[in-house]
Amino acid sequence: MRDWNSYAKGILQAEMARKQVKAPELVRRLEELGVEDNARNVANKIGRGTFSAAFFLQCLAAMEVRNLHLGED
């Protein structure tokens, strides 16, 4: 059985690495979308893999991720 929290965490971390975005920059970008948080909280959420689907989508939007490949082709 797949660990969905770890899967979402891995996707988010991979996109952050691909876009070269660290937690403080992600917080700045999230603020532009009206999402208020701090770098420590964001880093902890991502590190634990315990975040909502809304937070996941907000992060992807903040990083301007337009395509996400989920398959294993």
Functional labels for PLM-detected ranges:
Residues M1-R29:
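A short, Lys/Arg-rich alpha-helix, primarily the initiator
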Residues E32-T50:
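Recognition helix of helix-turn-helix/homeodomain-like DNA-binding domains
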Residues R29, L33, A62:
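Residues within the alpha-helical elements of helix-turn-helix
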Residues S52-L70:
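DNA major-groove recognition helix of helix-turn-helix/homeodomain DNA-binding modules
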